[in-house]
């Protein structure tokens, strides 16, 4: 029997191919649960999940909440806007307060890289990173991988082109780590101003042309232009950005005929992707949302139930 030896899910970094496969297989089981009429189980009955979102996120928070509830957990969404954090309380103070309530898992999203890892050091329960600054977003990478694997039957040796604002994207970082671990070929396509220094050292091919970067790609993953994280002139204008790096039907022709079109959401239609593509037959964007609930169910069950069936370490995946 394969055991999952980790207490927290802080990032994809530190996960083995076996760990990732285990979670994806678990998520496949969760998809079946989510598609049946009676969706609620008693797997996590009596356990408490607290969602602590310091950054606004409708879809991710709703996905985590639904995942916990479908497993039978008691789920509490902490509204940071009305909390002591707004009154000057530090993350550590918040962690100590929540830990005293004895939850079983804390789900955190924070604008600062490393926030989830810091929280994990201060609490006695499991911690799941729902996105920390520009660092990582592990469950997004897992749901993307599940979407690809279910459509293509594998992850190894497929060509994935990640296009757009790579510099500010924690989604890109987590996907690169996961896809490389699973044997995929990863490309990044972006203007030089939207690529982090040393990106090639992460084991990706770098392109500055959409036509060249998408050639023979099995998957085209578009990233949102994150204007709220920008403090400088990274692109001349939105119009020019779309002209060179937006995905429309004509640009998509460079990829394979059966290439998948993906986007982590929320989309900027007419900025990084055209509606004709986002809503077209090659789009699996809706499937990504569905797989998100399944992946988060798998993560919760694994951290809180499955890991107790075998040996584990208290070390973080960070």
UniProtKB/Swiss-Prot annotation:
It catalyses: carbamoyl phosphate + L-aspartate = N-carbamoyl-L-aspartate + phosphate + H(+). Carbamoyl phosphate binds at residues 59-60, 109, 137, 140, 265-266. It is an enzyme of class 2 (transferase). L-aspartate binds at residues 87, 170, 224. Keywords: Pyrimidine biosynthesis, Transferase. Disulfide bonds: none annotated. GO terms for biological process: 'de novo' pyrimidine nucleobase biosynthetic process; 'de novo' UMP biosynthetic process; amino acid metabolic process. InterPro entries: Asp/Orn_carbamoyltranf_P-bd (IPR006132), Asp/Orn_carbamoylTrfase (IPR006130), Asp/Orn_carbamoylTrfase_sf (IPR036901), Asp_carbamoyltransf (IPR002082), Asp_carbamoyltransf_Asp/Orn-bd (IPR006131). GO terms for cellular component: cytosol. Its EC number is 2.1.3.2. Pathway: Pyrimidine metabolism; UMP biosynthesis via de novo pathway; (S)-dihydroorotate from bicarbonate: step 2/3. One of its GO terms (molecular function) is aspartate carbamoyltransferase activity. Catalyzes the condensation of carbamoyl phosphate and aspartate to form carbamoyl aspartate and inorganic phosphate, the committed step in the de novo pyrimidine nucleotide biosynthesis pathway. Belongs to the aspartate/ornithine carbamoyltransferase superfamily. ATCase family. Heterododecamer (2C3:3R2) of six catalytic PyrB chains organized as two trimers (C3), and six regulatory PyrI chains organized as three dimers (R2). PANTHER family: ASPARTATE CARBAMOYLTRANSFERASE, ORNITHINE CARBAMOYLTRANSFERASE, MITOCHONDRIAL. This is Aspartate carbamoyltransferase catalytic subunit. It comes from Rhizobium etli (strain ATCC 51251 / DSM 11541 / JCM 21823 / NBRC 15573 / CFN 42). The lineage of its organism: Bacteria, Pseudomonadati, Pseudomonadota, Alphaproteobacteria, Hyphomicrobiales. The gene is pyrB.
């Amino acid at each position: 029997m394969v055991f999952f030896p980790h207490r927290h899910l802080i990032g994809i970094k530190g996960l083995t191919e076996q760990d990732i496969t285990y979670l994806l297989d678990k998520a496949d089981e969760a998809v079946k649960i989510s598609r049946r009429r009676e969706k609620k189980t008693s797997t996590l009955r009596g356990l408490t999940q607290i969602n602590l979102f310091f950054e606004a996120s409708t879809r991710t928070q709703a996905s985590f909440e639904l995942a916990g509830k479908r497993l039978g957990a008691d789920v509490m969404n902490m509204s940071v806007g009305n909390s002591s954090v707004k009154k000057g309380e530090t993350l550590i103070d918040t962690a100590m307060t929540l830990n005293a309530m004895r939850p079983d898992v804390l789900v955190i999203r924070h604008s600062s890289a490393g926030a989830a890892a810091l929280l994990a050091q201060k609490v006695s329960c499991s911690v799941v990173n729902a996105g920390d600054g520009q660092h990582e977003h592990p469950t997004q990478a897992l749901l993307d991988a599940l979407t690809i694997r279910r459509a293509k039957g594998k992850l190894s040796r497929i060509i994935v082109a990640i296009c757009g604002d790579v510099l500010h994207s924690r989604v890109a970082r987590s996907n690169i780590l996961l896809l490389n671990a699973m044997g995929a070929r990863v490309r990044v396509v972006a203007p030089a101003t939207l690529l982090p220094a040393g990106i090639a050292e992460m084991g990706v091919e770098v392109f500055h042309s959409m036509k060249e970067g998408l050639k023979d790609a099995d998957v085209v993953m578009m990233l949102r232009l994150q204007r709220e994280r920008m403090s400088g002139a990274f692109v001349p204008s939105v119009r020019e950005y779309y002209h060179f790096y937006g995905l429309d039907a004509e640009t998509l022709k460079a990829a394979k005929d059966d290439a998948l079109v993906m986007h982590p959401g929320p989309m900027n239609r007419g900025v990084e992707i055209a509606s004709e593509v986002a809503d077209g037959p090659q789009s699996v964007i809706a499937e990504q949302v569905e797989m998100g609930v399944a992946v988060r169910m798998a993560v919760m069950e694994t951290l809180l139930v499955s890991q107790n069936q075998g040996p584990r370490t208290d070390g973080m995946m960070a």
